[in-house]
């Protein structure tokens, strides 16, 4: 990371950033062509390994691509605000972000139910429980982060 002064390595702060983000941007490759989508997500962190859970219709281009090539990149960001100055060239933007690469695994059974509950917990602060019938109506996949980094530019008063 070029700007090491902005790198976030504290696991608690990384979790805080992830919790503040509501959209993960998922990048994949379809026969040499990049394809990028914004998705809502839930997440889990077990022994320092992050998984991000997404749901989808049971068919479509995204799923076709992921089944052929499960390698992905992802990005999420939050806490955005303009760092305004009188001179335009001195303006900037405050942010917090998490980026990484990983692979997709399609979920079923209990793992799928847990992922859907995680998604609702993150997006709506609810502890919904899902039935097998409800879960059957959607496809659910986990983005398993193989590499992950976090970065932030915060106002001086917040440092």
Q: Whereabouts are the PLM-identified features?
A:
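Broad gene-expression machinery/nucleic-acid interaction feature
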Residues: 23, 36-38, 71, 95, ...
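A generic structural signal for nonpolar/aromatic side chains embedded in well-ordered alpha-helices
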Residues: 17-18, 65-66, 119
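Charged, gly/pro-rich active-site loop segments
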Residues: 2-3, 79-159
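Helix-adjacent hinge/juxtasegments
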Residues: 56, 61-85, 89-91
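Short gly/pro-enriched beta-turn/loop segments at secondary-structure junctions
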Residues: 19-21, 69, 135-138
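Short beta-strand segments
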Residues: 21-58, 74
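Short N-terminal helix-initiation segments at or just after the protein's N-terminus
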Residues: 14-17, 36-51, 80-92
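Extreme N-terminal tail/first-helix region
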Residues: 1-20
């Amino acid at each position: 990371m070029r700007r090491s002064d902005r790198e976030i390595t504290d696991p608690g702060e990384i979790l805080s950033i992830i919790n503040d983000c509501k959209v993960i941007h998922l990048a994949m490759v379809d026969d040499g062509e990049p394809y990028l989508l914004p998705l809502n997500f839930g997440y889990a962190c077990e022994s320092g390994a992050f998984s991000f859970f997404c749901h989808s219709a049971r068919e479509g281009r995204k799923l076709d691509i992921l089944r052929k090539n499960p390698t992905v990149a992802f990005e999420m960001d939050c806490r955005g605000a303009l760092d305004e100055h009188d001179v335009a060239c001195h303006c900037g933007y405050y942010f917090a972000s998490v980026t990484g690469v990983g692979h997709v695994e399609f979920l079923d059974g209990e793992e799928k139910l847990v992922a859907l509950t995680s998604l609702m917990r993150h997006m709506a602060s609810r502890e919904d429980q899902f039935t097998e019938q409800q879960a059957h109506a959607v496809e659910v996949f986990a983005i398993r982060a193989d590499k992950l980094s976090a970065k932030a530019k915060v106002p001086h008063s917040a440092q």
